[in-house]
Amino acid sequence: MVKRLQGVLPIVHTPFTDGGEIDVVTLKHEIDWAYAQGADGLGTGMVSELLRLTYSERIALTHHIAEMSAGRGAVFAGVGAESTKQALIYAQAAEKAGCDAVMAVPPLTTGLPDDQLVDYFRALADGISLPVIVQDASGYVGKAIPLRVYVQLLERYGEEKIVFKPEASPIGPNLSALRDATGGRARIFEGSGGILLVDSYRRGIAGTMPGMELLDGIVALWRALQRGNDEAIYRVYYPICAIVALQLQAGLDGFLAIEKDLLVKRGIFPSDRRRKPYAWDLDAETAAEVDRLFARLQEALK
């Protein structure tokens, strides 16, 4: 039976060997660690470096995360691509692998008119039996998806088939606009890395999709939000915000560099190797500030 998406659903970071291949042993360690921290599931997305993987690597990664999760939580696969045909191939592979949902950004190299956006997501929804997470990643790549496209998809397929991860700025007001335009029916997830999680939670999200590097903090924050414990909320939230603020200065590559640096420091990854080319490296002074903030987060979690 397909598991319902909800709660804390981190995005898997792809570890690489010295030879540049997917490090399957480390991937398994990462997934086991995520569930040990209290993740409700996991999936692949932009910070999995999907756009830098080959076709066969993307398919293999999807199969790995489904198999390695072993029923411990909901699993979803990022399937967005530059053509509908490509995206549908990835989506059908995810269903075959045993995933519980797929997540798709629209094509990133061109701004599509509304009817083409609707057709793209409809092809995915009609082509598989799984739920489709409609992702707007325009906070760092691509263009924003108009609210009317979200509403049209929800009206056609319903809230169990189509769910949303809107990341266009300003995220908070956009979440509320989608919530209100759908009468509260839309199931919405946020993916700000934690920096907007408190605001988003208060607007009624169903879950969050952070990176792995701060997962213990995000789980603690989510649980504090569920309890309504403001003291615990802000004690954990502030160091998370400060770390994510450093990631934001360099876009997607800023997130990747700091995320993998922290995964190495945690002993989860043997190296911070990323797929080239990328636009930003972590300098010594930023790394030192990340270390100071990470220590504060760990202290807040005691």
Regions found by a protein language model. Give the residues of each.
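C-terminal alpha-helical cap/extension of soluble enzyme domains
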Residues: 9-13, 37-38, 205, 213-302
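Secondary-structure boundary/capping signal
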Residues: 73-74, 132, 161-162, 186, ...
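Active-site beta->alpha loop and helix N-cap motifs at the rims of alpha/beta catalytic domains
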Residues: 2-144
